Design a protein with these regions (language model features):
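N-terminal strand-loop element at the rim of the active site
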Residues: 12-13, 28-70, 81, 159-162, ...
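A charged, aromatic-enriched C-terminal amphipathic alpha-helix characteristic of glycosyltransferases
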Residues: 17, 324, 339-367
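Nucleotide-sugar-dependent
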Residues: 17, 205-209, 259-264, 271-291, ...
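Conserved catalytic-core segment of nucleotide-activated headgroup transferases in glycan assembly
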Residues: 21-24, 178, 183, 193-241, ...
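Membrane-proximal helix-turn-helix segments that form the acceptor-binding/catalytic region
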Residues: 24-27, 73, 77-80, 98-100, ...
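Donor nucleotide-sugar binding/catalytic pocket of nucleotide-sugar-dependent glycosyltransferases
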Residues: 40, 58, 142-184, 190-192, ...
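A short alpha->beta transition loop at the rim of the catalytic pocket in nucleotide-sugar-dependent
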Residues: 269, 296-297
Length: 368
């Protein structure tokens, strides 16, 4: 049995979107006959799991100071430890440039193929010494290192187009296991008297999610309630300023465990995904889009990344653009009857394109 070693800043088993991404890929590789193991990062080694879904998990400590951070981005883990696993393939998840090149050099000397799973184009703000180092690293990674890899797993069409002419590149959006009961896909699809919207996320660096825009629009629709998961009102006001006066239909629920957040999405009528058309958003692909579809919950979204390949206005959600503002979408929703909304939920349920099993043929282009 051939071995795959997955390296990167993921926190197993489901503490971040990175962990969910690599786990779905690992499940597919396992079904293809590969033995997969992980070396991720952790901020809490005492509670880090040694095994997730049957896959062995090891960790490096998340850096706490400048010295540790420099080692993290230039080495991550020793090449001796990598070779001790005797892998046939090493997959690097959003890996720093210098560490990538070191691993690539040693791996090629030992007949190991190196694949890069790339899910974002990071942005480093400011001009502090650390920010300058990050800018250099990001530039090297995206414009040089990626093209040297034996293969690239690109999360978005934007990244796929960047590297398809330079290496063996496959397009794999965020994927999930549709048989997992957390999606609760066999429940009765219903809608209540008050339309339930949900924002589930952390806003992100650079405020990639425009939660303030959503709140400004929803405040004038008392028959719509917005539930915010991932931050509390205090955190929101630190980022965006005070809540609008008289806004009574927004409820902040703070951070929740992943499974509880997924249940909240299942219990909602629409999920909100409003983002700018920035380089970062074009290069990535929102995991919450995939999760919402899997939960049978339609989306109200701007067309960041290539989600336009999947989102159909009025069918499985609503598109917000220059022709249809968020206010216009909310006006459409309050004019809908429950049957129409349930039909949209059913359309989401009928779509199974994000199940990881659909991408076996693509994976076989790299992993043989």
């Amino acid at each position: 049995m051939k071995k795959v070693l997955y390296l990167g800043g993921f926190e197993m088993p489901d503490k971040n979107a990175a962990a969910q991404r690599v786990m779905a890929n690992a499940l597919l590789l396992h079904e293809m006959g590969f033995e997969v193991s992980f070396i991720g990062s952790t901020k809490d080694r005492a509670n880090a799991v040694a095994e997730a879904n049957g896959f062995k998990c090891e960790y490096v400590d998340y850096p706490k100071d400048v010295g540790q951070w420099l080692k993290y981005i230039t080495e991550f883990v020793s090449t001796e430890k990598i070779l001790a696993h005797k892998p046939d393939y090493v997959i690097l998840y959003n890996f720093p440039a210098v560490a990538s090149l070191k691993i690539l050099k040693v791996s090629h000397k030992n007949g190991i193929k190196v694949i890069h799973d790339i899910t974002e184009w990071e942005i480093a703000n400011g001009w502090s010494p650390r920010a300058i180092i990050r800018k250099i690293d990001i530039c090297m990674r995206m414009r040089y290192c990626m093209k040297k890899m034996d293969g690239v797993i690109a999360i978005s069409r934007f990244l796929y187009n960047q590297y398809k002419d330079f290496t063996n590149c496959i397009l794999i959006p965020p994927t999930i296991d549709l048989t997992n009961t957390k999606w609760d896909r066999n429940r009765e699809l219903t809608v209540g008297r008050t339309i339930q919207l949900i924002y589930a996320g952390s806003v992100g660096s650079g405020h990639k999610d425009k939660l303030n825009v959503i709140i400004d629009a929803v405040k004038t629709f008392p028959s719509i309630q917005l539930n915010v998961i991932g931050l509390d009102q205090k955190h929101y006001e630190i980022i965006f300023g005070e809540m609008p006066k008289g806004c009574t239909n927004v409820i902040f629920k703070g951070r929740l465990p992943h499974v509880e957040a997924v249940k909240a999405v299942c219990d909602s009528d629409f999920q909100m995904l409003i983002r700018d058309n920035s380089l970062k958003n074009r290069a990535g692909f929102p995991t919450k889009f995939v999760e919402s579809m899997s939960c049978c919950t339609p989306l109200i979204a701007t067309l960041s990344s290539n989600i336009g390949d999947y989102l159909q206005d009025g069918i499985n959600g609503f598109v917000v653009d220059e022709n249809q503002r968020l206010f216009d979408v909310f006006s459409r929703i309050i004019g809908m009857n429950g049957k129409d909304i349930i039909e949209m939920k059913q359309n989401c349920k009928n779509f199974t394109g994000f199940d990881y099993r659909n991408f076996k043929t693509e994976f076989e282009k790299i992993f043989q």
